[in-house]
A protein has these predicted regions:
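Outer-membrane beta-barrel pore domains and translocons
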Residues: 41, 140, 158, 171-177, ...
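Transmembrane beta-strand segments of Gram-negative outer membrane beta-barrel proteins
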Residues: 132-134, 153, 159-174, 197-199
Length: 233
């Protein structure tokens, strides 16, 4: 009986020692890395490409609610075509003589080219330039990975991001041939829960230079962002 009792004491002692050994803290430290955002559709100063960057200040200076091709018409090797003669409605562009079917266009990294014709119909994106932070135009074969539309040139569009403080703004433009544009924009700024909401409403009207060139466009742009200590969504 004493031998059995002694064996039980030994087993309990071994089990207690094993639990204590498992409870010891791990000496290896765990490091949580912050989120890294990689943008691979734009060229840098060391990239062997011919490109032009247009910042937000220059976009605001040249913007009068016209479509992107007309806003960029002063760039080298770029020709803008506008059917109505006012810069709104049906517009297109050529870069180094290449038509729209070989010019790849991305918005925040997402391709805008039509999957069938490979063109971008700017008439469906009225007053987009008012919501952009920057544009990069790459002449010739560029950094895009979105298929055959990048053979002639590439255009990378980036929309405005959230601001720290709330804001509100309004603008109105009047031009020839009954052209009128008005837009209202507002943003909440960074809220306590990390959310930020930005929205813009635009209205573009024009009689056009030619017959049947009338334009009546409405555009609504909205962006919802969430910022945390380690991540941006």
């Amino acid at each position: 009986m004493k031998k059995v009792f002694l064996a039980l004491i030994v087993l309990v002692s071994l089990h207690t020692t094993q639990i204590r050994a498992q409870a010891e803290p791990d000496s290896l430290s765990t490091i949580q890395l912050e989120e890294v955002v990689v943008s691979a559709t734009r060229a840098g100063k060391d990239t062997p490409l011919t490109y032009t960057n247009i910042g937000e200040a220059e976009l605001k200076k040249n913007n009068s609610a016209q479509n992107i091709p007309v806003v960029l018409q002063t760039l080298p090797s770029l020709v803008a075509i506008t059917e109505g003669g006012t810069g709104v409605g049906n517009t297109s562009l050529r870069i180094r003589g290449t038509d729209a079917t070989r010019i790849n266009v991305t918005l925040n990294g997402m391709p805008l080219n039509n999957p069938e014709s490979q063109e971008v119909y700017w008439v469906n994106l009225p007053d987009l330039s008012s919501s952009l932070q920057s544009i990069q135009v790459q002449r010739g074969v560029g950094t895009s990975t979105n298929g055959s539309a990048a053979f002639g040139a590439s255009m990378s569009l980036k929309t405005v991001g959230a601001t720290s403080n709330p804001y509100g703004e309004a603008s109105t433009s009047v031009g020839s041939y009954g052209t009128f544009s008005s837009s209202v924009a507002a943003g909440t700024g960074m809220l306590k829960n990390g959310l930020a909401l930005d929205a813009r409403y635009s209205k573009v009207l024009s009689d056009g230079y030619i017959r049947n060139g009338k334009v009546d466009h409405t555009n609504l742009f909205a962006s919802l962002s969430h910022y945390s200590a380690k991540q941006i969504v």
